[in-house]
A protein has these predicted regions:
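Mobile, glycine- and charge-enriched loop segments
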Residues: 35-51, 55-66, 112-119, 123-126, ...
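Conserved Radical SAM active-site core
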Residues: 61-188, 193-209
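Hydrophobic faces of well-ordered beta-strands that scaffold small-molecule active sites
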Residues: 37-41, 93, 125-127, 148-150, ...
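Auxiliary Fe-S-binding modules of radical SAM enzymes
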Residues: 1-34, 208-325
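Short, charged helix-capping/linker segments at alpha-helix termini
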Residues: 322-335
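Residue-level signature of catalytic and energy-coupling elements of molecular machines
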Residues: 16, 54, 150
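N-terminal pre-triad scaffold of radical SAM enzymes
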Residues: 22-63, 70-94
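Glycine-rich, proline-tolerant flexible connector loops at the mouths of alpha/beta enzymes
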Residues: 38-44, 64-67, 94-107, 158-159, ...
Length: 335
């Protein structure tokens, strides 16, 4: 496979918005069934006191944030949460722990039991536990784990301004450890942290050139949290999310593109355009680890409406959602 370049990605960024969306839709339709949206539920199994210094994260022990800290929860609590998620329509259950790395001993033993309980409910199991070794990855795979999430967050250059307690290469190493164990990879990033469009292009370039490409790619918009160094960052503009989703779909045609954190700031029209641009997975539930998420009923209505529009395959209907975005991407993208 030919390597994707930052220049190719930046050329996509500067296409007129409607042209970018229709290009992404055509690629999406060749690789996924119409109206296919994966619903993923996310729970925090260990909250706060993380030794990492990620500037966006309220779980870091480095910042004074109003956050209720919790030790590793019981396996039974995870099972009940997974049962509820399935009852509400989720088909993927994700567990996150505020750790720099997964530790051998009681921690890995506990999460292995959690994975087994989730799998017993016929749900996909995904976890994010920080760095993992090759041996740990193999143990998680043996327990039935389907996917490991480890985001690269941003470009290699901008990364140093956001995190100092873990290197970019260490993130790539964990991704490779999961991959070598036969676990599918979930890896994406965050926009709205003060990075440039060049940085966004570089982040997507790194993801697209992983071999193979990640099975899941979460695109997150920063949710500024009081007490973190990024508390005063302005909210990401709606068209920025659409651009990132559509571009990710074009360069990673077979990956699930997940519309992730920050959805609570997006109107139904914006979220609809993200889905029409190739997003085919959302986090479904009241919260994402420590931040609020969309209301579940609102999501049900959104997906119902999306399936109706998608079934019609009408450019006129899709253009209805483009009316509020009359400016071209060139007015948004500043290198």
């Amino acid at each position: 496979m030919n390597k994707i370049t930052s220049e190719q990605i930046k050329n996509l960024f500067t296409l007129p918005l409607n042209e970018l969306i229709f290009k992404a839709r055509e690629i999406h339709k060749k690789n996924f069934e119409d109206g296919d949206v994966q619903l993923a539920s996310l729970i925090s199994i260990k909250t706060g006191s993380c030794p990492e210094d990620c500037k966006y994260c309220p779980q870091s022990a480095h910042y004074n944030v109003n956050l209720k800290k919790e030790n590793l929860i019981d396996v039974s609590e995870v099972k009940e949460a997974a049962k509820l998620a399935k009852k509400n329509g989720a088909n993927r259950f994700c567990m996150g722990a505020a750790w720099k790395k997964l530790r051998d001993g009681k921690d890995i033993d506990a999460v292995i039991e959690m994975i087994k309980e989730v799998k017993s409910l016929d749900l996909e199991a995904c976890v994010t536990f920080g760095s993992i070794t090759k041996d740990q990855a193999e143990r998680l795979k043996d327990a039935g784990l389907d996917a490991y999430n480890h985001n690269i967050d941003t470009s290699p250059d901008y990364y140093k301004k956001i995190i100092t307690t873990r290197t970019f290469d260490e993130r790539l190493e964990t991704i490779q450890n999961a991959r070598r164990a036969g676990i599918s990879v979930c890896s994406g990033g965050i926009i709205g942290m003060g990075e440039s469009w060049n940085d966004r292009a570089e982040m997507l370039r790194v993801l697209a050139n992983l071999e193979p490409q990640p099975e899941s790619v979460p695109i997150n918009a920063l949710v500024p949290v009081e007490g973190t160094p990024l508390q005063n960052q302005k909210i990401v503009e709606p068209e920025e999310m659409i651009i990132m989703i559509a571009t990710a779909r074009i360069i990673m045609p077979k990956s699930r593109i997940r519309l992730s954190a920050g959805r609570k700031y997006l109107s139904n029209e914006t979220q609809m355009l993200c889905l029409l641009s190739g997003a085919n997975s959302i986090f479904y539930g009241d919260s994402l680890l420590t931040t609020k998420n969309n209301d579940m009923q609102r999501d049900k209505e959104l997906i119902k409406q999306f399936k109706q529009i998608n079934k019609s395959n009408s450019k006129e209907l899709i253009n209805k959602y483009l009316i509020i975005f009359t400016d071209k991407i060139a007015s948004t993208v500043n290198y």
